[in-house]
């Protein structure tokens, strides 16, 4: 142990040295004196907790030094608000970023423990579900790595979204008990508590308004450390949990009415129990709105309090603070900040509004109008009456300004109003975000272009300078360095150094070696090892044995109709039919792998999961197929599972209907790991195509323009079915019970041949034909490996470091901590 003076306080303290012997002693110390466990009796999980505490000691100094540097240098801060942060396991990521992974591995070797087994004990934090949360997590990693003064805000969900189990082919939701593990990684902040209020009434007191709420709960803070790569900067992710306060009714309890004694407490604390409560009921919608306001109220109060501690005047808030809204869930932050500035700080309405418009920025993640969040005016008025007042005032201010310009007719004004008067009076949250933000960005070039010509076309006429693009990215530290150790060694060797982890553009040097037979062979071994790892997982967890020489065809993402997992199933069924018709043909064996969760209230998505499993049951047990097709559904998709699946992919499916996917980031992760894309011209597929070339990915289906033209002309899916016998047979088999003989009509609504909103029938033939081209390509081993290497070599643009640099330059106007402001390690 080394005695050292902490730069931010002047106190002497003992700082553990990052060597294996010291770490070993620290782990044992934590086990005995912090956890109170005899090392001879300790479980692998207890060893993990001790190791995490030892690692936290090493990281805590960076964390506190970073915070002090922000304060001492009066740095402008960005605060990132998101309902989701899909972090994945933190322990190994932190050790690699801190540069002490080898030392911890050696320490456990000295202890006679298998380090990999200990690491496997860590649960994925239940803080997110899909791409929205994973993007936020990648951004946190890049913010810390790039030394950006930043802080994330989210909710500490007690039960996550849910743990997915597959029972009789169907999704069953179970509580995700991730908080049952000890949380060595989080610092409780009992001094950071804020009151979050609901309901009541608003009193008009002359030129002021006073909100008198009827309900109040407390938000308590926990800080998760996010260490940057290189171990110099660490930023916080502040997570809020709901506490009801002193609501336990002792009188009821003493009378034996135990349920009544805790009813109010349980009701209030439900706010932070589950991510995305089922909103198919009135009570579910109310809980979800309360959850969103809970996040923004606690976060905005904290942001204002932090500013007032650092700066003498609240009026400089817009100069020192940027608040970013990740999708529409946190958009209530706009009226919440207005409420604080006007009601609590005494700032005039117009000045407060001008401050808000400089502070907020908003990322849009969807082009589907039905997915844009809206809330009933009556519900918002009942739960948040003061905020509804402010929203009305914002809307009136905006619409009056439009009318004053004089170039916009009444119909235009109606379309851009925050209040939708045509569907039962609803507050359009995306509209509020656009009006209250100084920048609105899409997340892929095609998405940003479509954003200003479709859902926000009217606003683009009013605020043409407000809209911009920041193409998403992913962190190579997790998606190569952690997920794919074999590829990491391969890149270190052939790029000549480890610098690609921070400068992903360095991957382009690999372009010089894509034709080298020895390099191709070496890459083939890396891919084979990854496939064997996944095959072992599938056999261990599901009892299904797969052929690792087969082409691994993978679609892993949230289950949704627009993502078109059903089209993938249609291809599988068609291939099944063709093999039975022509068993002597030299077929390319394929393993089709699915993973992803369906929202608990999403009937059709859950039906698609069941269809996949029913098709798998029939095909996997048909001996005539001879393992030429194997279909696998892996339950409970998570970041940790993705880290096993993605490196093993040969082909990845990005097959959403053109014009519906914002960017997608799984396509970037797959390409970074040497998988080839089967996709439509949608989202980031377009930009990946530009980078890797048409010979190194498979594009099929109609373009955005063709999709729109088909709709304008009156899309008739039955006409496609009538003229394509293969398609007709597939539709009939699925809808008439070939894969569900015990319930023949089970899937007669899945393909919806009379509606087919996502145009599966229109894209079917192109999809099938393109799949056979991929078969031919895969059989040419050298050509396939060359294409895979070209994909890796040209993914440098898709680093989340580049995305964050774009945000800092073009949207947040944030500068990183300099070496002088936060000195590196000696």
Give the residues covered by each predicted segment.
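A conserved ligand/cofactor-binding region detector
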Residues: 2-826
